[in-house]
C-alpha cells in the first residue's frame, strides 16, 4: 500500500499539489492522509498515524516547499509519530524495509536551489534522507515539481501525470 502524507497548509490555494493529489488518488492501493485537514489544531493522533504507517509499503511526504523546508505540521508529525522505541532506538523497527518518497512542489526553478558551495536540490533533502535512513527506511530519489507559480495548466497537469506514473511504476516493481 502507498501511504501519502499530504501536508499542504493552504490546500484551497493549491494548484500543483492539488493536481498531484487528484492524480494519486485515482490509483488502487493508495491511502492519503491530509494532515492539515485531520489536525487543524496540530493535535496529532499518534496511534492512528502509526497504524496507517504500519500498513504502508511506500510512504510519500507530499507538500509544497516552504522556506527551503517542510511545512510545520509535517515537521511536528515526524517528531511525534516517528517516536523512540517505535521508529528508531531500542526496539524501534516499525519502519524498517519500507520505502520513502519525498514529493515536493516549488515556486522557483531548479537553478534557484543552487545554494552556496553545495549546488543542487539534493542538499535540501539531506535532513529528510537522514531521518529516513536513521529509521530504517529506503530513501527513493525525490519527485520535485518546480516553477509551479509560472507553469500553465497543461504543464502542471503533465507533471501531475508524471507523479502518478512514478507511483504506478513503484507499485508494479514491488507488487507485480
From Swiss-Prot:
Organism name: Escherichia coli O157:H7
Subcellular location(s) of the protein: Cell inner membrane
Cofactor annotation: FMN
Catalytic activity: a quinone + NADH + H(+) = a quinol + NAD(+); a quinone + NADPH + H(+) = a quinol + NADP(+)
Superkingdom to which the source organism belongs: Bacteria
Alphabetical list of Pfam families matching this protein: Flavodoxin_2 (PF02525)
Major place of residence: membrane
Protein name: Glutathione-regulated potassium-efflux system ancillary protein KefF
Family to which the UniProt record says this protein belongs: Belongs to the NAD(P)H dehydrogenase (quinone) family. KefF subfamily.
Biological role: Regulatory subunit of a potassium efflux system that confers protection against electrophiles. Required for full activity of KefC. Shows redox enzymatic activity, but this enzymatic activity is not required for activation of KefC.
Amino acid at each position: 500500500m502507498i501511504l501519502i502524507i499530504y501536508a499542504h497548509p493552504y490546500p484551497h490555494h493549491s494548484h500543483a499539489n492539488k493536481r498531484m493529489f487528484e492524480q494519486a488518488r485515482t490509483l488502487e492501493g493508495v491511502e492519503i492522509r491530509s494532515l492539515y485537514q485531520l489536525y487543524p489544531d496540530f493535535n496529532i493522533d499518534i496511534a492512528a498515524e502509526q497504524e496507517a504507517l504500519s500498513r504502508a509499503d511506500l510512504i510519500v511526504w507530499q507538500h509544497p516547499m516552504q522556506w527551503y523546508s517542510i511545512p510545520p505540521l509535517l515537521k511536528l508529525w515526524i517528531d511525534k509519530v516517528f517516536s523512540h522505541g517505535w521508529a528508531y532506538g531500542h526496539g524501534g523497527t516499525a519502519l524498517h524495509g519500507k520505502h520513502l518518497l519525498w514529493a515536493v512542489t516549488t515556486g522557483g526553478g531548479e537553478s534557484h536551489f543552487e545554494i552556496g558551495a553545495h549546488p543542487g536540490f539534493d542538499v535540501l533533502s539531506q535532513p529528510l534522507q537522514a531521518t529516513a535512513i536513521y529509521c530504517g527506511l529506503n530513501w527513493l530519489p525525490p519527485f520535485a515539481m518546480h516553477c509551479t507559480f509560472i507553469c500553465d495548466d497543461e504543464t502542471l497537469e503533465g507533471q501531475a501525470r508524471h507523479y502518478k506514473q512514478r507511483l504506478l511504476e513503484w507499485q508494479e516493481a514491488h507488487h507485480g
